[in-house]
Amino acid sequence: MSPGEAPAAAGTYPAELECDVLLLDGRSARLRAIRPEDAPTLRAFGAKLSTETVYFRFFSPRRSIGDEEIAHYVTVDYFDRLALVAVVDGELVAVARYDRCTDSPPGARAGGDAASGQGMDDAEVAFVVRDDHQGRGLGTVLLEHLASAAVQRGIGRFVADVLPENYRMINVFRSVGFDEHALLDSGVIRVTMELASRPEYIERVEGRDWTAAVRSIEHILRPASIAVVSAGSQDGSVGADIVRNLLSGGYTGAVLPVDPQAESVCGLSSYASLSDVPGPIDLAVITVARRLLSDVVRACGSKGVGGLVVVSSGASDDEAQSESSDRDLVELARNFGMRLVGPECMGVINTCPEIRMNASVAQRPPPPGRVAFSSQSGGLGIALLGEMGARGLGVSSFVSLGNKADVSGNDLLRFWEADAQTDVIVVYLESFGNPRKFSRIARRVARKKPIVAMKSARTASGRRGAYSQGAGTVPDEAIDALFRQAGVIRVGTLEELLQVTGLLASQPLPAGRAVAIVGNAGGCGVLTADACESYGLEVTELSPRTQQRLAEAVSRGVATSNPIDLADSATANEYRRVLEIVLEDEAVDALVVTFTPPGPEGAEEIAQAVAEAASSATKPVLANFIVTDGTLSALRSGPRRVPWFAYPESAARALARVAPYAEWVGRSEGIVPSFDDLDVGAAREIVTEALAGQAGPFEVVPAATTARSVWLDTASAFKLLEAYGIPILPWVRVSSATEAVDGARSVGFPVALKLDAPVLVHKSDVGGVRVNLGSADEVAAAAEALLTRFGPGVSLVVQPMGPEGVETVVGLVEDPSFGPLVMFGFGGKQAELLRDQMWSLVPMTTQDVRELVSGLRSSPLLTGYRGSALVDLSGLGEVLSRVARLAEDIPEVAEMSLNPVVASADGAVALDARVRVETVLHEPPLLRRAMRTA
């Protein structure tokens, strides 16, 4: 069990285990620990079990579960004995439990290692699911959550006995990761599962989570029937508008208006209540007044509705009240197994020919296409839909997320990955709920389909506005790191969002950054070339063969170097032929075509030539036509649309956003390195002792509070690094001049003498550092001066002088939303001034490390810039990887700064370290927690 990790004490009800989970059919269930008052419910549960299910659970036929057994099952201490129950629609439908084996060594009490499972206890485990709920994944998800709770309580392995003919239970155990070990003499099969996190176990959990999320969204985006609640009979009412949009859009399913005040809506008979609707309802779109929401959601649950889209406002303008009301609404929906979009959303759209659903307030939805779009801002989302339609950019589906109380961007990303109608995904975000989960999901999805994201609130004023709208704030550097690692294309403006999306939706990805430019005005070509270079693209040299072919193709003679100027007399045929030749040049990865009127032929004729040349190209073609209107129908028709840009800078910028994504897709993801020399136990002991000790000079939060935050003294910080194999200069901690001299002799002259004061960012600023001390007399004098200046009781640290090399800084910060963030930059006294830094989320792959090291403005200093010495990049990368691993293993490390880390040809070594630790409450491992959104 990790230091600082404190599950509920034995006998105390563990409220932290309560959560909502998604099942394989897309519905949800509530999980919680069993309580003594569950005895009547458990008795009713047992009465509904079939004879076969009872036999398989208890290995003997019986008619019912006795009162003594019931009392035993509901009486647990939540530590050595724990049971979780699943509740659906107020009824207990499944139970899973463990009992710690009495003959196991007391691993948890001895400080077992949860990461490896060593020194942990065994526990017997069993579960049973009510017959009418079997096959929904309840047993699997209960075991996953029970395993998570068990690890936190010092359990390292589950053991279970199963009858050979109980193939369903055996399959559930196998799906979770149990291994069959033996057929016992009693005729039962013994299965076991190690609870230490294993890649295959995490992969199984993610796979089940993925399937459940996709199926849950199908109720919302692929419904066979839709009830519009409070449809209203008057024109202009939101409900009536949605009914009208469903009908006018040709929705292929049943439209069911529900309004007690209306006899008919848009020519359809209206039902007085949901219970009056004959047949099943897949989706309910709710537009009632806020005060009626809970009653309507409850009625939907009783009817068995699959999903909800809540257009109504969830609460008042008070943010705290709104969040509380949203939580209550979601909890009510989850009690009936329903997913919920909203509240305060603008609806959902699916243009798939088999669905044709416009269950939104959008009067003019975009045409069918291959772009999926979600927006946290309802009004902005509807406006962008209209602009997409005006640009001829088709949409596969659209979801207005509103308050994002339940269904989130994470759910939609997983659905759209599997959606055959979607090629490009666009998300507009105002806040993150679970950014680490978003990162995991986006990294997988972006390998198959590009994700274009706009995250608002980048500036201080923007963050104030986001807060007033209920959107959370996180460091913008962290968001950049998240998007970069996950392959998400981040854009800064709405115009850029539309332009990049249009490029991705119509053109192939570039193979590199080499751009060719063809136009009929030299000035425009130069502007385009400048823009390309400024955005990190390369205006490439054309091959001699291409230049020869160009000279032959245009008889009047043109400049055949890149950018190519065809002059203002260029005809459509000349454009077409030149474009075809340039696109065949292997040195060219992308082509930007410019046109400036007037010319012998109009813009439409030139556009037709561009469209024809681009129709069979395997490289992206972008068109910059400086014309008074943007109709250019030729660019929008034909087998492949050509994206049009009003200005050359816009075309260059859009291409520059896409090129890094193409590189990301084409390179290896890398691996998360493993290390077999870590002393995790020693590291945890250092942290535990610091947090359990008496308040000292390095205490940040008063010890009277429930949480503690403490700066490690220098010796403890150095020992923590040593436990994780992070190179640190030899050191000796001393408290007198005599000890300082002895320490200097042991590490070797010349030495540095430093004040042991980790709360100080730069000890040199207060005169706390002496360097290049070459003799015992110099060391003694420096030590006396420091001890006199800073008073009795202080300690000093003696180290040899560091090697020559490049000073870098490696940092670590535990962000409450993003988790651990690793920072790399150029260090020393100038670190804050230069601000040449990059951030990365953990876990970090080898590719993430390479990008950190090579992505800084000053990175050439590491690779021999202007004759400087080469640096051992692998050694520097290993330091970063080890820091990332420490961040994963020891989440109590809230802040760390290794400044400087000197990188040289011989490797990388830290000269100093500041480490702050704090008590934390750990979130359980990877689990299906539907209430945690992003």
Where are these regions (language model features)?
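Catalytic-core regions of core metabolic enzymes
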Residues: 198-934
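Long, contiguous binding/interaction regions
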Residues: 2-219, 934
